[in-house]
């Protein structure tokens, strides 16, 4: 008899149904040669530090690093009953094999193995590895169970990831919390992610906003532009010279462009698209997709592949055709799926791309909850787009001369809509208000053509800072480990995995390090305080991505767990050494907070607090508020570096201050004007150069 252990009850029940197991017991189902039971998420986890030694209940820098010689594991307090049931079932003499039917991925392997090992079971392990919860897929999976030994490397990878998070989290959190006298939660992956968000906020805050002007030359079906004139007066002169005067088309260049269909979804690209179109968080999308998977409507969600295998070609084509017939908005679109471009056996390892299942054709989609239904439509639409023809168009660039000035007009002529027709039909059907795509107008001009009496206008613009991260763009940055470019040929590593990135974002939010402002993710004062004191060694996105890559190689048997743990332990030693070398007592206030200078009033420390830079002696009262109205009106955020220099020198040179009166930016020296009761500011300007 086989004991089948699923990751959670709902999956266990679905497996039992597919196997014809019907006799319900307390915590399991029995019959037809099987016992089907389940975990409830993580039943067993790594023990806390104080389980190794009572002294670790108190946080002391002298005790660091804390690195267990022999790792201990504990049963979750509220889950001991289910663990007891599983242990009893494993001991059952009727059971000859244990089938690991937990999630077919790294975390599912860990959940099962920790329970199996904690129960001291030594019976043979078989592995169920499926990408669909359809009953046929389940039965096929049981007909082709894998040897559990084949997944030993995956287990070691999962266990090392858990140990690394434990070691870095406990040691770094205790170290920096004690150094700065306040709780600073540090994580192996979450801290580099927070650092990326912080750097983006800094780029936005310090962006030198500059005004410029465009001069337009307009006629019927034409809007040519002379771009980025710095001075308004110069732009007005161009406008006056050109307005109503004859213009001539000097040249017309055309270029044919082909845009291939998008890839099928992996989890990350699905999360990004759902955030962009619907505003769903990464966690919401994962939850909805997991629900659809358990409803047998889509394939396995936690995948990093955007392709299917060649043996799935006919199935994918049939599903695409049935999905197209199921969704009314495709009635006016030609559907002729071609799967050749979505097949790549080399780029499918554990699981293929997320696609709908054949169950969709026989399901009443109106009964599917709204969130899940939107994700299902998104996945179905992507399958149809990915298997359609390329989008082909022609760009047109015309150079136009008027009164000695050069203007450029751009347009686009569509040759074949291809997959774009499907996407547009989908967007209209879903009424995605936030969906935007720049589309150039059709342009029809010939070289030498004369444009009579065009109208000339001036438009005002500002250079734009980088945009705040959304979950869409943050997921992309995490996938790329903070770098800007990644090619199709390079194997992707990154911060976290497709399965864990959503939880990292949620953890940063729940910990108060970041907050959501509509779709934007913004670093809080608490997050700023944490990152501002972290050494580069723990903020490095690329280094953390290297660890993730090592874990991936370990799962493939190409990197040893022993070497990984040696490297992680060295990392912790380096973090502690660097922190002790760079942060001494002069940098830490007895009352908590990083010291940035000496109070100009009383000579005591000025420390960083969530809302200000203030004297540690409350009786002194010296404080520089982070949201001071002077800097808010000037649209120039007061950074820690600016506050440090104000305190040290009494003045700072600042570029790009904003004047409400003139609606212009200017440069000036901001001087600290401390009355002894209030901190004010005054401006000094460099003397104007005399004209010779």
Region spans (language model):
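Short, polar/flexible loop-turn hinges at active-site or ligand-entry regions and domain interfaces
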Residues: 71-74, 102, 122-126, 147-154, ...
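Amphipathic alpha-helical transducer elements in NTP-driven molecular machines
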Residues: 9-16, 33-36, 40, 76-87, ...
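Basic, low-complexity terminal or inter-domain segments flanking catalytic cores
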Residues: 2-3, 79, 90, 96, ...
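Intrinsically disordered, low-complexity regulatory segments
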Residues: 1-162, 166, 464-465
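C-terminal or mid-to-C-terminal helical accessory/interaction module adjacent to the motor/catalytic core
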Residues: 93, 137-219, 254-258
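Metal- or metallocofactor-binding catalytic centers and their adjacent structured scaffolds
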Residues: 232-265, 271, 542
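Conserved short loop/turn motifs at secondary-structure junctions
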Residues: 1, 101-104, 181-183, 254-263, ...
């Amino acid at each position: 008899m086989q004991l089948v252990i699923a990751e959670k009850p709902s999956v266990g029940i679905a497996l039992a149904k597919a196997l014809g197991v019907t006799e319900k017991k307390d915590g399991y189902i029995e019959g037809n040669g099987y016992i089907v039971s389940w975990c409830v998420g993580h039943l067993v986890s790594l023990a806390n530090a104080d389980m190794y030694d009572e002294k670790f209940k108190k946080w002391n820098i002298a005790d660091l690093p804390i690195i267990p010689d022999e790792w201990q594991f504990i049963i979750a307090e509220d889950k001991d009953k289910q663990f007891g049931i599983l242990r009893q079932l494993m001991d059952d003499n009727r059971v000859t094999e244990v089938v690991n039917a937990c999630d077919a991925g790294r975390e599912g392997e860990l959940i099962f193995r920790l329970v199996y090992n904690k129960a001291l079971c030594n019976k043979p392990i078989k592995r169920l590895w499926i990408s669909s919860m359809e009953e046929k897929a389940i039965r096929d999976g049981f007909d082709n169970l894998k040897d559990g030994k084949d997944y030993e490397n995956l287990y070691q990878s999962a266990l090392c990831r858990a140990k690394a998070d434990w070691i870095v989290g406990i040691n770094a959190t205790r170290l920096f919390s004690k150094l700065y006298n306040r709780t600073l939660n540090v994580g192996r992956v979450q801290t580099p992610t927070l650092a990326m968000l912080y750097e983006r906020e800094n780029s936005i805050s310090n962006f030198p906003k500059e005004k410029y002007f465009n001069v337009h030359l307009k006629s019927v079906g034409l809007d040519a532009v002379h771009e980025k004139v710095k001075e308004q007066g110069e732009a007005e002169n161009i406008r006056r010279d050109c307005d109503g005067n004859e213009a001539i088309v000097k040249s017309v260049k055309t270029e044919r462009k082909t845009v291939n269909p998008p890839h099928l979804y992996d989890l990350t690209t699905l999360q990004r698209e759902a955030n962009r179109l619907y505003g769903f968080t990464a966690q919401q999308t994962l939850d909805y997709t997991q629900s659809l998977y358990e409803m047998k409507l889509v394939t396995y969600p936690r995948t990093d592949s955007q392709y299917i295998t060649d043996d799935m070609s006919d199935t994918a084509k049939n599903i695409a055709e049935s999905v197209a017939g199921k969704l009314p908005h495709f009635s006016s679109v030609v559907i002729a799926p071609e799967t050749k471009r979505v097949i790549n056996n080399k780029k499918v390892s554990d699981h293929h791309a997320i696609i709908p299942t054949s169950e969709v054709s026989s399901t009443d989609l109106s009964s599917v909850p709204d969130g899940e239904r939107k994700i299902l439509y998104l996945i179905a639409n992507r399958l149809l787009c990915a298997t359609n023809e390329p989008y082909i168009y022609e760009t047109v660039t015309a150079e136009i001369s008027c009164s000695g000035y050069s203007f450029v007009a751009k347009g686009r002529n569509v040759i074949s809509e291809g997959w774009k027709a499907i996407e547009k039909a989908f967007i209209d059907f879903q009424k995605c208000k936030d969906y935007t795509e720049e589309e150039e107008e059709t342009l029809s001009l010939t070289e030498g053509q004369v444009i009579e009496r065009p109208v000339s206008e001036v438009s005002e613009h500002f250079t734009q800072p980088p945009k705040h991260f959304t979950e869409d763009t943050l997921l992309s940055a995490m996938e790329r480990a903070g770098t800007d470019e990644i090619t199709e040929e390079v194997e992707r590593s990154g911060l976290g995995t497709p399965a864990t990135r959503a939880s990292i974002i949620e953890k940063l939010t729940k910990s108060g390090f970041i907050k959501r402002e509509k779709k934007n993710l913004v670093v809080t004062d608490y997050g700023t305080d944490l990152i501002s004191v972290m050494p580069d060694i723990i903020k490095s996105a690329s280094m953390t991505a290297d660890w993730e890559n090592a874990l991936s190689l370990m799962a493939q048997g190409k990197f040893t767990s022993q070497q990984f743990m040696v490297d992680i332990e060295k990392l912790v030693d380096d973090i502690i050494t660097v922190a002790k070398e760079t942060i001494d007592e002069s940098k830490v206030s007895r009352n908590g907070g990083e010291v940035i200078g000496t109070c100009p009033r009383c000579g005591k420390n000025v420390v960083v607090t969530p809302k200000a830079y203030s004297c540690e002696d409350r009786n002194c009262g010296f404080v520089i508020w982070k949201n001071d109205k002077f800097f808010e009106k000037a649209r120039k955020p007061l950074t820690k570096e600016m506050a440090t220099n104000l305190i040290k020198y009494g003045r700072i040179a600042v570029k790009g201050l904003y004047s409400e009166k003139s609606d212009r930016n200017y440069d000036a020296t901001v001087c600290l004007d401390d009355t002894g009761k209030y901190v004010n500011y005054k401006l000094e300007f460099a003397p104007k150069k005399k004209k010779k």
